Amino acid sequence: MFLISLVSEHERGKGCPYVNDLTEEQIRTELALILDRRNADTRLSTMGAGSDDLDAGREYLANTVQGGWHVPTWPKEHGGQGASANQNSLIGRVLREFVVPDLYPFAIGLGMVGPALLEHGTDAQQTDWLKAIASGESIWCQMFSEPEAGSDLANVALSAQQDGDEWILGGQKTWTSRAMWAQWAICLARTDPTQPKHKGLTMFAIPMSLPGVEIRPLMQMNRDAHFSEVFVDGARISDQWRIGDIGEGWRVAMTVLAHERAGGGSRGGGDGNARGLKLPSWVADLQLLVGDQSSDWRNKVASLYARDTASRWTAQRASDEARSTGSPGPAGSGAKLRTVSSYKGRSYLANSTAGAHGMLEDSHGYIETLTAPSMSIRGGTDEIQRNILGERVLGLPGEPRLDRDVSWSESRRGLI
């Protein structure tokens, strides 16, 4: 009767009233009821491969948002459960047992924009945007990087000039993932070029359908075009879409990036085999490629499995830390490095196991192998993550920054 009462609460869209009291088995039973009752799509695809099916992801999120299962730490009124950090970890562990649709198109909204809005957004912004993000109704992209501002993110040149209660934006962004799907973008812009580069920035939300916004997809070597260039020419936005105070854009950006590295909020589910086989599905896929499994091959798989497990634990620890403290720390950088290493290891082993067939498009690991090099760049390069760990964890001296106290306009003219 307890679970039936919970289901009725989900049907009414009120969420789970006792989420922090649920046991692991009760959570597992409830999620199974929801996914089975709703006939949720059970396809699972690798990031960047087959993730264009928006309908399946939207159906899954629309189902889970009624109980706040996908972003449980968010407030109930915004699509969550108001769950504790400990209960969130428990829900995440159970959710990874289920095979769910690829949520790659929705990950920025769920894992980065949502937490930033909860920390820096106004009440009106949270009401307008968070529930739509949690339900999959609204997709967001991240407009940070520029042709001359990648790892040096604070060097952004896209300008925002205030005109009454509006802002006029102009400039270019690049490597904007999910732009072709997105209804909204979170955009870092320069509002005061007379300030040092970190201080003259402000964060905005921009409708991607706005006049003056042009999206040009960038084809990658794995034949995906999930990254884009975005050109902004005289686009006008309301001051109500400014996120945080004027000149505080860098602080908001650091919140976004910290949650990106920690992987907070952007659960994509698991492989569906954890309870039965006690092994992730990529191991089973590799086993299909080889008949007589040599001891050397088994040792490689065992090593990768250990690294993969450590990667997931590190990411979970970083995510838990972010939620419990309200401010993601440098642990997210360690999680990002481990995740990249694990992804590359799995991809390269799958490709080498396939032998000569691994050079063909239909081979297992082909797309992943072509995607792997980009993993060390996207979301902050490996070098940036190591700098963060060196300075904030090991206490090593930071790199000299001659432009820290010089106005951005002077640094751009080469006056330092």
Predicted features, each with a name:
Residues 1-108, 125-128, 132-135, 294-302, ...:
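Amphipathic, small/basic residue-rich leader segments at the start of a protein or domain
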Residues 20-22, 213-312, 375, 411-416:
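Glycine-rich beta->alpha junctions and the first turn(s) of the following alpha-helix
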Residues 65-136, 178-184, 308, 315, ...:
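Internal helix-loop-helix
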Residues 81, 333, 337-416:
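Alpha-helix capping/hinge segments and adjacent helical runs
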Residues 136-144, 188:
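A short, Trp-centered hydrophobic/proline-enriched beta-strand micro-motif
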Residues 158-161:
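A structural signal for short hydrophobic beta-strand segments in well-ordered beta-sheet cores
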Residues 165-166, 170-218:
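A short core secondary-structure module
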Residues 298-303, 330-337:
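Short, charged, amphipathic alpha-helical segments
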